[in-house]
């Protein structure tokens, strides 16, 4: 009961507070999707997106509770950078592929691009990150899909990287006129308010179930421009969250998006 009250109190403080500066020096150029009520998507990334049965499962859980038509494919490579992915191949019809059924030439409404955690801030990797982000954004658009660039989170033992990652990724999303999804900023906001709610695995890098839940809530809220607050969906992979923790993360996700994009709460 005590933990429940503490969680509720922390969440109420966040919701009642005025807009506070998120940990980034770069404002987004694109603040909402052009596609309305997307029904199909693809996630391209690495284990950050695949942990805990995959972020796609969390988004599907929110969509199912909300009664929305939504399906998505996830393609991840362990420790994969954006350069590891052949997006053009992923968007080529393959035999028995349901996304290209009946000659469908626009299989996905949105494509989420999630790079390796260090490539946007590692001096040796930054040029490759920029090159392939640009290439993948162009490839996504050529297929009729809207690209979404995922802003990843800092390692648990390097919270100072939150701003570095956000600034680098958002700047490149802006350079390509693509929308950035500030997942890493939401991680930072959650950890400020609820340091007891662990978002990183013991390796201090990959997400716990709570981290994946927050990631999924961010994706869902961006796709449909809707707050997930109040959803009963507890999570995936036999790792359900406590109701008070799920509510807190729902609130963090929506507040972060509203503060970042300038949306009305």
PLM regions and their residue ranges:
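Bacterial N-terminal signal peptides
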Residues: 8-16
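N-terminal low-complexity, Pro/Thr/Ser-rich intrinsically disordered segments
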Residues: 23-40
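Positively charged n-region of N-terminal signal peptides that target proteins for export
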Residues: 1-4
